[in-house]
Amino acid sequence: MREQFSVLVISLLFSSSYGQVGQMGPPPGQSGQPWTLAEFDAIDTHLKNIQMYARSLQDIVYQERMKQYPFMPNSTAGQPNMGYSTFANDVINRLTKIEFETGELVTQYPLCPSGGTGGNPYPVIPPNAPPPQNVMIQSETIGNSSSVIVSWDRPNVVGTDVRLDDLQYKVYFAPLDEYGQQTAEAIVFSICSVNQTVASITDLYPRSFYKVSVGTVICSTSESSSGAKSLKTPDIIPSEPTNLRVDGTKPNAIALRWDLPLLMGTLANYTIYVTSENGTGFEVAVDPTQVNAILYDLIEGTRYVISVSAFSDNGESPKSSSIEVMTDVFVPDMPRFFQVIFVNTTSVHLVWEPPNPGAGMIRYYSINYTDSLYSQFFNFKTPNAKITTAIITGLQPATTYYFRAFAHTGRRAGAGSAVIMQDTDITVPTVPRELYAQKAKNDPPRARLQWLPPAKTYGSLKNYSIHWGVKNGATRKEEIEPGLLEWYSDFLDDNTEHEFKLYAQNEKGYGPAATVTHRTPKRDTVVPPNVKVDRKKGKNNETVLVVSWNPITQPGKQVSGFRILYRKFEWVYTGRWSLKEIPDPNARSATIGVENSNYSFIVVVRGYRNPRPNMQVNPPWPGR
């Protein structure tokens, strides 16, 4: 501040002297003659005297200003009559000496004559120089003192023959109030040469308002100023809050209190730093008017390390000394009224009510469950404590399960509820396994089916049901005892693909079918001609079918006997064929006793030949 004030005084004296320069002749060095050593010594003497008087004047004015003009920091405001009686005389005396020395210096070397002839650099007074460009202001506060750095770009001097060495800059500075009104007269804070485009203003109040502008000067008679820029100096960075302490603890909360920082301006907020014993941390912002806070949503029975810092608009203070606090221990009670409200084959819907209120927070609930064989144990968790219902899925039908509910804090589980035993609903059996079909008899063709029971019967099986017939044709249905794992078909058509579908049934119903196909071989059959069937009454008044046929006359069609297949005629095919075998190749008729005399019957007669000794009628079961 002192150096800038001396520059201000010198600038003012230069300005008062330059008005007389136009009446003087050319300076040394501009009349065609080089300067002598004596001329250099004379100028040097004047400069030393100016500096000496300026420093003396600066000390006097600075001391007085500290008493009377306290808009700068580090000063003590006083009454206007606090100056000593000879202050004005001392200032005038030194100003007179400075003005004399300056006038002598300008007489020997005028910087910028106002006009004339005979080698003067400016035949006329130069026009106003343009103002500096891109004026920028930055402010910072360190400790309890603020500073402002002003920077600018050199103006574009175009269209005039101006020596840039004659260019100077003036930095103007004035205090403002918070509403932007100027509270004191602007002063020239710094005078800079043409190559100096940065100036600093120091020893300012933090969080104070100022106005700064920069002017361009040529020959001290021509000046253009930039637009004024307003700024607020940053606040001081506060010291750390003191005496951080605990007011109280609960399972999920800690009450804190602290004292104000010893060094502070206007605070923006406090920040509380919290780190738990497992290393996780979080921060809490607190209003600057408060010196206490309550930390919520903590984990019970957990140690926390806590510190606090203060913020101004200029940054954060150091953190306070940390303290270690442990929240209270809390174990919740058991959930109440735990019950099942819905069940189906694979899921159970459970509900409950929260435990009796305690001192701590419940975070979530869990359901532990297993089947009656304790083969596997499972756990279901609710997302939060607001949910007091659970739908347990993926269960097995017709199975007994045990369920138990627990309330959880952030650290531990409470007491378990009463255990609930619940059976899931029964469902139909799964598909019979490893269904296999093979030839059981070749003439007439029959199939033999074998299988294994379903993997899941869900109770006892009532029976099996097989649906079979020519593929994509009419089907027949038969029931099979639940203890049997084998079944023989009725006589089948030659050279035809048959389809068999096997279902298992429990008390719930039929499950899905296992399917297998079997194709009968193509055979060369012998059918006797002119087959006839008559219905008659026998000796005991029973109904008999008299079947007759003519002899087989085709060459090479010798038979060993005849087989007669017969069954009652039905629109819906339900019954099986009956077989009567006549081992006489010369037979021409046969009598068959039947029931249900009111039904019509279907009769098929075929000749057969006995197999040769090397023929296998029933090949062995594959893999057996």
Swiss-Prot record:
Cross-referenced Pfam families: fn3
Record SUPFAM superfamilies: Fibronectin type III (SSF49265)
Keywords annotated in UniProt: Repeat, Secreted, Signal
Expression tissues: Prismatic layer of shell (at protein level).
PROSITE patterns membership: FN3
InterPro entries: ECM_Regulatory_Proteins (IPR050991), FN3_dom (IPR003961), FN3_sf (IPR036116), Ig-like_fold (IPR013783)
Highest taxon listed in the record's lineage: Eukaryota
Primary localisation category: secreted
Name of the molecule in the record: Fibronectin type III domain-containing protein 2
Organism of origin: Margaritifera margaritifera
Lineage summary: Eukaryota, Metazoa, Spiralia, Lophotrochozoa, Mollusca
